[in-house]
Amino acid sequence: MPEVSHTLDTSFVIRLLTRDPLPLFRRAAEFLGQWKTGAPGFLVPDLVLAETYFALQHHYSFSKEDALSALLSFTRHPAISVSTCADKTLALPQLSTAKPGFVDRLIHGASERAETPLVTFEKSARLLPNTIVLKV
């Protein structure tokens, strides 16, 4: 992961992606706009991506596809760093209809980084390596 100088939170990312409210969007855009090529960038943790994904849908009426597209575009900014898992997951084709979905894949990525199996009841997770799907 490239060197980072700050971690961005959900409220910051939401303002950039929704432009709402406008004064906060302008301030967030100004802050991001101060970044210079070659300078340390900004980390966006998986939890922030997951919260933003749900907030865009439930508070701003984005479709799953539009929320994921907005996150993908945002994470492609040269100053933005995300986990390898988030980067690869956001690049998956048809992610908005994929099973397991975006957040489940982020959770699986965290279990891989921890070098532990993921234990779940989510049947679709059987497609992911090192995953135990419990049956009732």
Regions found by a protein language model. Name each.
Residues 1-5, 108-136:
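Acidic, PIN/NYN-like endoribonuclease modules and their adjacent C-terminal/linker elements
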Residues 12-13, 51-55, 90:
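A general alpha-helix detector
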Residues 15-17, 55, 128-129:
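Residues that scaffold the ATP/ADP-binding catalytic core of kinase and kinase-like folds
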Residues 12, 48, 87, 106-107, ...:
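Alpha-helix capping/helix-boundary segments
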Residues 8-9, 44-45, 100-101, 122-123, ...:
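Histidine- and aromatic-rich ligand-binding microenvironments
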